[in-house]
Amino acid sequence: CQTTPVHGLTAEQIAALKSEGFTQTEDGWEFGLSDKVLFDTDEFVIHDAARQTVARIGRTLLKVGLNSVSVYGYTDSVGSDTYNEQLSARRADVVANVLVEAGMQRAAIQTIGAGKRNPVADNSTATGRAQNRRVAIVISTR
């Protein structure tokens, strides 16, 4: 007996998302990489441990038939809006490239450079700025 998908997702897909650390938001299921994929100031290089995490997530998503994602890149508040939007787009692209290496189709990955919008921490402290240099992988349920 198959259960009815919640907003288009099956119970198996939801279980896989939860097991990878995704949380449900108003936009869908989100894996926030602020504590797992932190970018250095003015950088868009993904570290090896973070690369492995993203690749594992990509393989898990594909295994349960979740073939498309949105990747949002973010920055801290230092720098101009234009520069931060470009830098955040590069961060999203780097994560998208790792998902492609894991087997996802590039055309199925939307990347968004959100700049300094939607901070998760206080930009007035070094720790807060570090947490805001992040990427989020979102599975839309709309």
Q: Which residues does each PLM region occupy?
A:
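Bacterial Sec signal peptide processing site at the extreme N-terminus
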Residues: C1-K18
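Periplasmic peptidoglycan-binding/anchoring modules of Gram-negative envelope and division proteins
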Residues: Q13-Q24, L38-Y72, V100-E101, I137-R142
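Short beta-strand/turn micro-motifs at beta-sheet edges
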Residues: S19-G21, T25-G28, S124-A126
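Conserved beta-strand core positions
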Residues: W29, N67-V69, I109, V135
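Early exported N-terminus immediately downstream of N-terminal targeting peptides
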Residues: F31-V37
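Periplasmic OmpA-like peptidoglycan-binding domain that tethers envelope proteins to the cell wall
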Residues: Y74-R142
